[in-house]
Amino acid sequence: MAKRHVIFVVGSTATGKSEWALKLAQEFNGVIVNCDSVQLYKKLDIGSAKPSKAEQALVPHYLLDYVNPPEEMTAGNYCRDFYAILEEIPADKPVFVVGGTGFYFMAIEKGMYPVIPVPVEIQAQVALELETEEGAIRLHAEMMKADPEYGAKIHLADRYRIGRAIELIRSQGKSVTQIQAEFESQRKPFPFPLLKIGPSWDREVLRERIGQRVEKMLAAGLIEEVQGLLDEGLASWAPISSVGYKETLEYLRGGISLSQLQEEITTNTHQLAKRQRTWFQRDKDIQWFDGASGFAEVRTVVEKFLKP
């Protein structure tokens, strides 16, 4: 019986990972599963650099154009649907999972901490105590006493994490460190052979690629795409807060000029790419290849990985 093989194609925005995934899926008779948290949504095409309909027709694509507005997708739901979709894909077809949303990749590979319900009255009491500086200091001290290992990582100003830790301590009788250790002890390994690859670029070259992409997005009708979303009453839809959309929304509301729009999208995309690069560089299992000249080498690595 064929053993399913999964290939993560990861990297920062504008690195060409989607192009690599498409070429590889065509050559090795595979499928593509989207792992970009914006490309999941219908109606978000230009600003998310979603593959064109012609490209999507070349190989089967999953979790792309998947969620209808105004619905929203959580990482937990993505992880659930990812594994459900794998059941639909023949085991002999390699699965190329492509995107830049590192948290989603981590969720499907390593699982997610369970969402532990906390009684409303405890939530309300903790929220009340956090309203004052003195209350936050007391709760921080309570956290440090019950969970010094976790508490040492949390700054006094991070009231959200302080509050969540106290909610768990009071409702579960366990520290965050204990809960995390229990989860880790039950964590199951990824169930399929896994290869992780990604294109890498010199930072200045990537900066140029990002600038070119932003120009193309605006020329392709990004402003009209966002205006259409506004016309449908989707101004408060959470995905519109993503890079490219939030700046265009500000432009349409008269907050910035057209030249400022291009500049802001470009700057914020650079910052996004930096965050993505930092996230993925922590994963030492990812094999990086030159974005301009490394595809032949990537192809060889994938071919070897897929050999029975």
Swiss-Prot record:
Q: Which SUPFAM superfamilies match?
A: P-loop containing nucleoside triphosphate hydrolases
Q: Which organism is it from?
A: Bdellovibrio bacteriovorus (strain ATCC 15356 / DSM 50701 / NCIMB 9529 / HD100)
Q: Has the keyword Secreted been applied to this entry?
A: no
Q: Which cofactor does it need?
A: Mg(2+)
UniProt function note: Catalyzes the transfer of a dimethylallyl group onto the adenine at position 37 in tRNAs that read codons beginning with uridine, leading to the formation of N6-(dimethylallyl)adenosine (i(6)A).
UniProt-annotated binding residues for substrate:
T13, A14, T15, G16, K17, S18
EC number(s) on file: 2.5.1.75
**Name this protein carries in UniProt:** tRNA dimethylallyltransferase
Note whether Ribonucleoprotein occurs among the keywords.
no
